[in-house]
Curated annotation (Swiss-Prot):
Region (A): 1-339
Protein's job: Molecular chaperone. Has ATPase activity.
NCBIfam families reported in the protein's UniProt record: PRK05218.1
Cysteine disulfide links: none
Protein name listed in UniProt: Chaperone protein HtpG
HAMAP family linked to this entry: HSP90
Family, per entry: Belongs to the heat shock protein 90 family.
Gene Ontology CC terms: cytoplasm
Quaternary structure and interacting proteins, as annotated: Homodimer.
Amino acid sequence: MSTNQETRGFQSEVKQLLQLMIHSLYSNKEIFLRELISNASDAADKLRFKALSAPELYEGDGDLKVRISFDAEKGTLTISDNGIGMTREQVIDHLGTIAKSGTKEFLAALGQEQAKDSQLIGQFGVGFYSAFIVADKVTVKTRAAGEPIDKAVLWESAGEGEYSVADIEKKERGTEITLHLREEEKEFANEWRVREIIGKYSDHIGLPVEILAKEYDEEGKETGIKWEKINKAQALWTRSKGEISDEEYKEFYKHLSHDFADPLLWTHNKVEGNQEYTSLLYVPSKAPWDLFNREHKHGLKLYVQRVFIMDDAEQFMPNYLRFMRGLIDSNDLPLNVSREILQDNKVTAALRKALTKRSLQMLEKLAKDDEEKYLQFWKEFGLVLKEGPSEDFANKENIAKLLRFASSKNDSSEQTVSLEDYVARMKEGQKAIYYITADSYIAAKNSPHLELFNKKDIEVLLLSDRIDEWMLSYLTEFDGKQLQPITKADLDLGDLADKEQEEQKEQDKTFSSFIERVKTLLGERVKDVRLTHRLTDTPAVVSTDNDQMTTQMAKLFAAAGQPVPEVKYTFELNPEHHLVKKVADLADEDEFANWIELLLEQAMLAERGSLENPTAFIKRVNSLLS
C-alpha cells in the first residue's frame, strides 16, 4: 500500500529530452537495456564503497547482482538490483530533473537532423530515460541501503510531462525498474532477445547479470524456472589483453562513458614494481558537447584493489587531457581514499605522471602510424591539446610534436602540418620557425606581413585559434629553433634577407626627410616610423616590438575581461610602392596628412580587423576618391 502520494511535473528540459530521445534513438533502441544495467552496476559499486566504512548497509546480503525478468503476457520487462537504492529526495532529484550544467545549451544545440541528434544525445548520456524508447509507462520501486522497509519509494510515469511519487514498503534493498512495453516492442519480453542484448552489451561488467530462465529436462520438457547467470561477471580490465576482443573493449567503453560511438583508440596496461596498478585509457572519437564548459565533469573512474571508489577522479590527468576516458585500478592507494587525500598524495602524483606519459605516447604512435585517424582526433580535440604547453612544462616537447597547424604552403585552412614537418623542409640558412597569428585563417593567409616570405618561398605557419597566442607565449622553441612571429618590427631574417643592401641604404637616405615628416605628424600615436623592405604589394604595415604585447594577445586579454595595456605600433612604409612615393612628394600639408592617416588606418585595419573610428575612415576614403 502506498502513502504520501504526489504528482509532479518534469523539469522542462526533461520533457524536451524525452521527446527528442524517443525519436532520435529509435533506430538503436536496444541500448536502453545496456543503460539500465550500467546504472545497476554503478549502484552496486556505490554500495560496496559505502559499506567499506559501514558494513551494516549490506543488511546481510553482500552478494550483489542484477536480475532481469519478463512477463510476455503482460508485456513487461523488469530490471532489479540490490545496490545502494534511493531515498524519496534522490528519486525526485535523479528521475525528475537533469542535474547537469549546460543542459539548456545542449538542447539548443540539437537540430532537426536525426543522425546528428542521435550522436549528441549519445554524448549527453541519457541513462534511465532511455527506458521510454520502448516503454509507454515505467514503474520504479526503490529502497536506499540503511533505510527502514517502510521508507521505500514508488515512482511512475508515462513520460509525458509528469510523474507520481509515493512511499511504499519494500523488503529488498535496491532498485526495481519495470518497463511496460509498447505494443510494437514486446520482443524485449522474450528470453532469447534479452540474452542476445546482454551478450552484446553487458558481458564485460564485473557484476553478475541473471535472468529468470526456464529449466528443461533431458526430453526437453519444461520443469520450472531458475535464476541463471548469463554474463562473464569478471571486470574486463582484470582479464589478460590477449583474451579481450576489440568488440569487448568498445562495448566496455560505452558502458563506462555512456557514449554511443566507438572509441578512436585505447591502451590497456598492467604495471608491477614500485607501483602496482592497471589502467584502461580510451580516446573518444567525438568531443563531448560540453568539453569547454567549466563545470564539465571529467577524469577517470578510480578503483582500489578492484573496489570502486569514485567517478570523475580528475587528479590522474592534466586538464589538457580532460577528454581521456577510462579507469585506473590501484593497489597502492588506501581503500578509504577521498578526493582531498588524492589531491596531496605522492602515489597520485606518480600515477598522474605515468598516465599522462602513457596518453601522450598513445597519441604520438597514432600520429606516426595513421595520419588520417590522427587528423580526425585533432579536429575533435586539437584545441584542448593546445592548452598543454602552458600547463605541463615537463612534457612540453612531446606535446609540441602532437600539434598541427595550417601553413602558407597549403591552400587549405586544415591544420595538418606538424612542427617536425616544418623543420624538415626549412630553407638552408633559416634559423627560426616563422608564424603569424590572426583572427581567421583568411586574415592570416592574406596578411601583408607574408609578402616577403611568399616572395622568398619561406613557409609560415598560419594560426587563427583564439588560444594560439597564449600557447605560443609558453612554446617559444622546438628542436632548438625559435618560434618567431613575422609581425614583429625587429624581425631578423639573417641570411635569408634581401641581398640588395646598398640599394636599400640609398632609399633610407632618400626618404629620411619624409620619415621625419610622418613622425612629426603622428607624434605619440605610434612608437616609431620607419621604412620597410619586407613588403611587395602593400604600401604600409604596423608591427610590434619583441617586448610588446601582440595584437592577438591584447584581444585575448580583452575577451577575458582583463585590463589591456596600450599597444603602440611601429608604422612601416614601403618605399617601392607608388602610393608611398606619391605621398612623399606632396607639398600640401593637409593632403599629406590625409594620405598618411589613410595609410595608417589601412595598416591598422589589416592588423586588428577593426578601427576605433570606422566612420572617419570612410569619410577620408570618400574625400580622397572625389
